[in-house]
Amino acid sequence: MKHIINPNSRYFSEYKPNHLVISKLNIGSHLNCLLSMLKKNRTATKLSYLSAVLAFISVNPANAALSTTTVNSIKGDKPVFFATESIVNKLGFNYNGTDYNEISGNITSNTTKYFDHTTNLNDFVIKSYFVPRTTIDDNKGDYFDINNDAFDPKQPISNTLNYVWKDSNNVKIDPADFNNIACSHNKYKMPLKLEITATDIKVHTQFGDPNESDPVNFIETQSMGAQPITKTYQIAIANTCFAKPYSLISDPLTQWRSVKNDKSENDEKWNLTGIGINNIPKNKPNFAVGGGVTEDYVFNQGFKVTPTLSKKHFPTTGFAGAQFQLVMGGVQNDYTFTTNNSSVTVDKDGLITLNQPTKTVTITATLKSDDKIHYDYTFSLDLWLEPKLQSFQNQNDARAQCTGSSKLLSRKELNNSSEFSTKNLDGAKGRIYNVFTRGIGYGVFSEWGRSLNQQYNSLIVTYPKSNWKFGWYYTNESHNTTNDNNEAISEAILVSSHDGMISFPSAWGIDEAKRAVCGTYL
């Protein structure tokens, strides 16, 4: 015999021979039913009537006295997590006590979110922000229990969150760079991407059976079918990073030069890094011949805004048409650039142009999306130069071009990179090979690099708004030597605008132009 009470209900009972399952909620109705059956049997004695009642009472779910009775747990519906397309917007992170996710509106996937220069990627705590539905049709929520079971107060929902930091070219960020990522332009293309993926999403109730939902690992999209539950945000760290001379922007292949190990001539190729003279790498300063860069210069980026060696910021020298870019963390176009000095201009990309002699200049970069984040870069010029366009046959004619407080400069003011910048060159003849070292305060050509206002043979223009031409520039110094007839002469000392080489007119003949550059201390 089978007796079923409301089989569609969460609680129901079945009555079978030797197998009795009874609902906690329907004990009273079963008891009345059994008593009615017994009363119909008029031959039953009081004892048998009482025995039957006692036998029924012993079938309480809390009582296991009957060996033929099995009590099963009460079954209901599983809680449900709704894997809609919008749930990816509830993946986010907490940083410095603030929660960020697209559903809250303080970050979106299609724009770059900036944080200030103190940001450490290790401090981002990846989180999900799923909430329960108040009703089954509440689209603002993400999970529901149709039987109204209470959710587990300690862990109503669980999931596995994986994340990865990448740059704009999908290069994975090395965790070693997490604490200083803003100015890692040589390693990563900005902005960064934070990719968050949720798997094994489950809902948990406190008492229900079952008390856990099926795991969710995908969402069904209308256009692409099943897709992983992944959200990607664009992140950038605001900061001032580099002061980048325009010569580096226009011609990155000629950042520094070196001298061949046998000193027979300068290396034809620039930017070399192998072992050089005196076992010093060719990209490091070498006082014997110059060349390489100081610790204040970063390959392909220019000078650090916070120098390691120098106590001053780049530049300390200037000329009309000198240009450099203030390189920022993130994307240049995300900032507004202004200056406090009318003698210089700065464009929308942070490209600064020096127009007139001036002493101290401050450039301010303000984040467009948050004007509370802004940075000042201040530099002070010590020396202002005026290169002359024409060439001159001798040092005296060149000197005559400098009037007032201006004058021809010393070799160390143009290139102070090697022993040839200051040593006595009396008796020297021919070509002595040496070049500039890129460093702040190492002279005009050491700061600004190869200087040229128009193309010369295959050489690319580096400062188009300046008056620098290819050639040799007279200094205010000379040395005693002899000519081809072994006659004693006094000869001017020159410096090349191409690579800062210090030399003499007789070493290069009359075919290469000799020019004048006048300087004034500010």
Describe the role of every protein-language-model region.
Residues L66, W256-R257, N261, E268-A288, ...:
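Short, structured beta-strand segments at or near domain termini in extracellular proteins/domains
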Residues V305-T338, T345-L414:
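Extracellular adhesion/carbohydrate-recognition regions
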Residues L385-E477:
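Conserved hydrophobic ligand-interaction patch in extracellular adhesion modules
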Residues V444-L522:
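Extracellular C-type lectin-like domains
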Residues V59-T68:
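Sec/Tat signal peptide C-region and signal peptidase I cleavage site
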Residues N147-V346, L351-L354:
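Extended, non-transmembrane interaction/recognition domains
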Residues M1-R42, P285-F287:
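N-terminal secretory signal peptides that target proteins for export/translocation
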Residues N72-T160, S168:
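Long, solvent-exposed N-terminal ectodomains/accessory regions
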